[in-house]
Design a protein with these regions (language model features):
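Glycine-rich phosphate-binding loop signature in dinucleotide/nucleotide-binding domains
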Residues: 7, 63-68, 87-89, 128
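Single conserved hydrophobic/aromatic residue that forms the stacking wall/gate
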Residues: 1-9, 13
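Active-site HxH/HxHxD metal-binding segment of metal-dependent hydrolases
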Residues: 10, 14-69, 149-153, 157
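A short acidic Gly-Thr/Ser loop motif
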Residues: 15, 77-78
Length: 159
């Protein structure tokens, strides 16, 4: 499906953990913009924000912000509904907590899974062009080319 979002004020949350979404309901109200969230994280959203609404952000969905086409890619692991947002023409991936510089995102939280995040990286992320810049949810940016060669090392170390 294609969504045209006329304002960058829409809130897109790539995973449902408090370090990223605590202010979402209030921000949504203040700027009159919807919150977008993968439905698999809906139970976590409702646990923290009872009765608060969100719009579904589904795997493969595309939308445009400020003239940039973006594609949603489901990458469970950090949370059940984690997604990354890929701006193919810009050569950028907004990875949230799915991929950091130096390894996969954290999986030590409730509802996280190391095996699942590794599968997500193999299935959706590490096959992107090597020059793709990865804008992470924490820390410095990196590239797919800098990270992909280390997959087996991450699997061996278990994080």
């Amino acid at each position: 499906s294609t969504h045209c979002i006329s304002s960058a004020a829409s809130d897109v949350y790539k995973r449902q953990h408090s370090d990223h979404i605590d202010a979402a309901p209030e921000l949504s109200r203040l700027v009159d913009a919807p919150v977008y969230l993968h439905p698999t994280d809906g139970f976590l959203w409702q646990r923290q924000n009872p009765g608060a609404h969100y719009r579904q952000l589904l795997d493969g969905a595309t939308f445009t912000i400020a003239g940039t086409d973006l594609r949603v890619m489901s990458t469970p692991g950090h949370s059940p509904g984690s997604v990354v947002i890929y701006a193919e023409e810009a050569g950028e991936l907004f990875s949230g907590d799915t991929l950091f510089q130096g390894g996969p995102g954290a999986t030590g939280r409730s509802f996280s899974s190391f095996d699942t995040i590794i599968h997500s990286l193999q299935k959706s992320v590490l096959d992107l062009p090597a020059e793709t810049v990865v804008r992470t949810g924490h820390g410095d940016h990196t590239t797919i080319g800098a990270e992909a060669p280390h997959l087996e090392e991450w699997i061996r170390r278990g994080f």
